[in-house]
From Swiss-Prot:
A GO biological process held by the record: establishment of mitotic spindle localization
Gene Ontology CC annotations of this record: basal cortex; cytoplasmic microtubule; kinetochore; microtubule organizing center; mitotic spindle; spindle microtubule
UniProt region (Disordered), positions on chain: 314-377, 651-675
Sample GO molecular function, one term: microtubule binding
Purpose of the protein: Microtubule plus-end tracking protein that promotes the stabilization of dynamic microtubules.
Main localization of the protein described in the UniProt heading: cytoplasm
Name the record gives this protein: Protein CLASP-3
Cystine residue pairs: none
InterPro entries assigned: ARM-like (IPR011989), ARM-type_fold (IPR016024), CLASP_N_dom (IPR024395), TOG (IPR034085)
A Pfam family that the UniProt record links to this protein: CLASP_N
Extent of the HEAT repeats: 905-943
Keywords in alphabetical order: Cytoplasm, Cytoskeleton, Microtubule
Transmembrane feature ranges: none
Amino acid sequence: MTSRIQPKSGGYLLSKSDFTKVFEDVPKIAITSSVDLRNKFDNVKTILSNTSEDWNKRQTQLKTIRSLIINGEKLVDRPTMIAHILQLLGCFELAVKDLRSQILREAAITCSFIVSKYGIETHSIGEDILIPAMGQVAVSTKIMATSASTLTEFIVEYIQTRQVFTILSSFSTSKDKNQRRQLAVLLEIIIGKWSDRLKKQIIRQICELVKSAINDADSETRAAGRRAFAKLEEFHSEEADALFLELENSKQKMLRGGDAASSWASINSDKGSIPIRSKLSAGAKGYSNISAKFLAQRSASAIDPKALKVTGPSRLARPLSTKAMVRQDTSPAGSKIPYPNRPGSRTRTSSITSNDSRDTSPTRRHSPLPPDTQKARVKYGNGSFFAKLGMSDNTDDDEFLLPIRVRSPQKPNLGDSPADNVSRVLKECCSSSVTEKKDGIKKLLPIVSDTTLSSTEIKNIGNCLNRLLSDASNTKLILQMVLEVYAVFIRTHSSRLSEWLRLALAKLFARKATETLPNTKKQINHTLNVILECFNAHHQLVTVCELMCDPIHLMVPKARVALLEYMTSLLDEYTEPGASINHKELKAALRKMFTWIGDQRQSILLTPYIEKAICSMFCVNVADFSALISEFDSDQKAWLHQTLQLNGLENGISSGSGGSGNNHPKATPLRETPHKNDSVVLPEFGSAQKRTAINLGSFNTSTNAALSKLEEQSTSRLMEKMNLNSTVTLPPDTLEKIQNVQDLLHKMRVSKDPDEQENAISQVYMKICDGGFGIWEQCYAKLLLNLFEILSTSRSENNKKMCLRILGKMCTAQAAKLFDSTEMAVCKVLDAAVNTNDATTALAVDDCLRTLATHLPLANIINIAKVILIQEPIDDERASLVLKMVTRLFEELPADELKNVVDDITPCVIKAYQSTSSSVRKTVVYCLVAMVNRVGEQRMAPHFTKLPKAMTNLIQVYVNRAISTSLPRL
């Protein structure tokens, strides 16, 4: 590493800056083509999957991954590169779990580089390696623990998903203080950097975790919890107030005072303290209004202890801010007056020499921050921090005590009219200074919320926002602030922005075309959605058509794509069926679309979006659409007719232009298919369904008759469901997605080349991860059958692993659709695990079985488990996996639900202890321990009477050891 910090305890500590410095410190690799890049990734996967490989080679391959990403991004597009990276998911898990510090460090650097570069697009990597990374935080080796800690910080910052928070919550009850401390650190990142939309869903859980950290037994964890509380106060003050009231009195004092004890000691030390009377007399020269008698009283105590009513600190009243432990005098004499703010306390008056006096030290500067900002940033900070900032938060008594300060009177802005104020803020927004521009945008936000703005002010604000949006020099933060102001401005004044809308849309489309960051694009889409909601749909449609034909605003191709997407959303979601669309602006827009299609340089990019927009127009009003294109030439009409038919719209364009104007199209078959029930699928899937029904028997690789029967029943139910699901009527916007997915499914099934099959599987997996697989009704059953066949027959371990991950995602997203195929799914996953020596495949099988067990019907899971565990002779490999699955079942599900099945499954689990395999017997013990922890010893006692005493004692030992970690998750 180029930068390392060696602590006193030995070892090295790694920080985020250390990681960032070596992200691109890798050997350069020559890559000739995309095929060469894929081969190099395959070679990396082969070496990293083999845990017995030399560790130097594996460390080098982890660096190679970063080099391939850096040097290969010019040869392939972003989705292809991400697909290559996702194939290494199992390798990353193994590397992060490795016990050698060099491997873990390099894996942490590489994974941090990936998640920081690709963000949410690689969320599956971050979610899968977060658990092993948190596990490594607990190790005693500093280099390993800090590498894992830094990796978790990168993951939490860039992978903002609910799953990440769920995983972190599970460590709140960890027995290791390092893991709990790291959780508190990560909570600070979540509170400060996650989106408000996501935090709103989990804010209650966040508060509970912060509360747990504040009450932790470890002092460093408590300190991290207080920092997280300060961050919570900064971003969510109401929730912080509620949490403050829930804390014990002692914890409230800690939040109010922070490290006040250390500050108190330093202030009142023999060397640093000065008698208050002498300090005041030195600093009060020339200020005759301060009574010497009063000062003499104050030096001892300004409060009559007899008149003081002693009360305990209230838990219901929370102070607005912590009082600083030191007050600083700014009188001309430069004296400083240290005294505590505790009633009745005395200041030490030990005499000191002039050499020790603080009068000789340089005068500390006041913080340049305004008081409000200081209070917001350190409202619950410690006393020493307040003293460093030189903050003053005085009571009335304190103000009376301090010398009078001559302040220059502030100039009141009485002459500034509201219009002048708006002009001044707009001028700041257009400043070349980044700081001044940020301040101006912050001031602009409350201004645009004012409903009493004049028309001139609204026009000026709109022009300023458009200039800010088109300024390419703006940082990401400034752009986000501008878009927030945009949204508020539109919601408040949409009725007065009709003329401004056209220019605003042009700027938004142009900005969206140039942006590459997903989060920024998402915020631009949010602003466009606000426009869709606030403006009249007809006015928006006319405005978009005029913008499309505007000879001045010549948009780049990607901006035209953004316009077409906006137009499609407007027609599909915000335009009422039957609304009139027979307008000259729409006719001109259609002609412009044909012009774009005729341009060979742009047609490939724009044609799919143009087809969607045309289908959306047709669906709004068939009669008006027919009248709209009546003057088009025959070639254009033929192309429109063919486009509508290919997208499943009945009879294409109606022959007449008359009608009621609210005719609605109906979905029809895309093409003639051999299968009479397949009304919306391509022909190859109609025939594939027949072949699948015939060859389903070949899926069965189990020799057990009971398993065969379960699979046959499950297959029959699945085929019935697939036939029922094949006649669903579809809206036009999903037909293209269906065709794309069906092409991928066809490649998955018929391809004999493992690489080609792997590419198709990877694309399906990416669609599911990105949320683009929204057509479950038509493709779920077919995809499921393809996965089952690959799991049973494929010789490619990579393809099996990807299929297992897809099956887990399908179960998580649409568990109800898999209910009828529970037994078959479990059998196929077990088939994939048999006769494999790949460690990453075993990990994928365990994860998939866990997902199936916790999402599918409990009765079906218990049924298949019983069948496998009572086999004679017992199948050790399958039995071990099933026992792990049952263990997860009892760890995850509530006790009330499990009590109904515990008597059925326990005898089968105990019988499995007769296996000759030590791994099976060990898994049986862990399974019984999980049962005892979940349903209680009393419920399990009747079953334990049949066990040998030695085994009962062994189980009791494990129960006592695990009972503290078996609590339900938050």
